[in-house]
UniProtKB/Swiss-Prot annotation:
PANTHER family: AUXIN-RESPONSIVE PROTEIN IAA17, AUXIN-RESPONSIVE PROTEIN IAA18. GO terms for biological process: auxin-activated signaling pathway; regulation of DNA-templated transcription; response to auxin. Its main location: nucleus. Residues 180-189 have a biased composition (Polar residues). Belongs to the Aux/IAA family. The lineage of its organism: Eukaryota, Viridiplantae, Streptophyta, Embryophyta, Tracheophyta. One of its GO terms (cellular component) is nucleus. It comes from Oryza sativa subsp. japonica (Rice). This is Auxin-responsive protein IAA18.
Amino acid sequence: MEEEFKDKGLPPTLLHLIPDGREWKVKEADGEGSRNTNLDADEDKELELKLGLPGVQQEERAADSREKIQQQQRESSSEPSIGCFPTHSKPTTSIGTTGAKRGFFAIVGATLEGYNQSHRDTEECGKELTLGDENMAGERKKGCCPSPPCSAAAHSSNPQGRGAIPPVVGWPPIRSFRRNLTNGSSFKQSPERQNDEADDKAKPICKKRPLVKINMDGIPIGRKVDLQIYDSYQKLSSAVEELFRGFLEAQKDLSCAESGEQGAEDKIFSGLLDGTGVYTLVYEDNDGDRMLAGDIPWKVFVSTVKRLRVMRRSELPHDMIGADPVK
């Protein structure tokens, strides 16, 4: 064939170098069948039901598309180049060459189109990622980084759909009545109650005992006296005389009764407060100290007295005798 073109003086073209178009027709038929099968497989995969997150299916589709593109590139690279075609002595017809040309350009065009589309998709994804990173960096510099809309919607829907979360009580758990007691003690008091407490504090502290024990030397039986009904030492002295006069009359000496002495009881109780009589009134305070009755004001005496005793003057210490009573 080359000799014929040399005789005519014309250079050979690409289509005249292809000896036979049967192989290209077979490849074209195979390519169309493979495309049809691939499309059917893609449709089956799209209609297939799978369990997973929403973004997983998109990732799988992208991976499948990348695998298809790589497979097509490998097939195109494995095909023989134009310069390696074998030469045959048989002449070729124009019909075979046109069919081979169409099949070859269809395969190459589809491969290039798929590769360009995947390249554009990857570039767009890269641009979106870079823009998103730049926006996040700018927001962090400004000091405000809002959460994504999906998370915000989830947070906003949670309090509406669910009830209020109970407060943590710690471990071990506290019983309900103990928790109520602690909460009740922490509440502030009402203003009226606070005013009443302030008034009570302003008043002088006066510990008033309803009844105080009183004993007398020589009489084994004690008595009790209410200090609230008296307002002075003189009234208290007369009350003590009335309490123990009957006991003294029962225990008086027979010699005094035979001699007919009268008014002995009056002499006994005449000097209870000043210490000039046979007996003297002594009290014991909160600290346990013994003191003569009448040395402090009456109100203070009532608030501090713990016990009363009528003692003989001969048994008193010399420091206590001769104190001036307070009336």
